Amino acid sequence: MRLTHPFITRSHDLNGLFKNVKTLSQFMKRLEKQSKMFPERYPVEKYLGDGWEFFCEALIKSHPCDNRIGISEYVPVTKNDNGVDGYGVNIFGEVCAVQPKYRSNTKGLLTSTTDKLDSFITEALLEKNIQPSKQYRHFVFTTAKGLHHYTDHEKYRGKVKCFGYDEIRSLVDNNLHFWNFIRGEVLQFEEKVLSLKGNKK
């Protein structure tokens, strides 16, 4: 298995989340529906965020040689989340930070303060001792439209590449290779669980 985000073990119905899904909007509808199933056990916002992080891990790992993304060696951060949800290596061979942000409003824009992106770059620089670079090297993946102009150009100074709703749609909508990649990972996980249960009998 290549996907390691804990959501793969915590989701309410991982198979149901991806079965016959072909578009980003279909995935979002199912994720939002599942998020309301057991809110006392798994808070809605937490479920949406974790599900989106899992999706983004799949997106990144299924496009390592595609220079539109070009992130390799990606590892999700599952503890001490202070603004960075994962690290990888970008197309320039540099360590890069990744921040997925799920938003139900696909027309909205992310801002550094409202959407808690203030610590993103700072945390990346400190945690991995990343040196400043002339080219963009960090990534935000969001179901919102994108970054607010001020956040993009003044706060991040063009060093963060944001994949918004429309850009992600162009990568995954009706892309059966991508959706089958995720379903294959889900199937492997389910087979592993069944195997472990069988060994305990």
Feature locations, PLM:
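Catalytic centers of nucleases
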Residues: 46-132, 148-152
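Surface-exposed polar/charged interaction patches
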Residues: 34-37, 123, 127, 174, ...
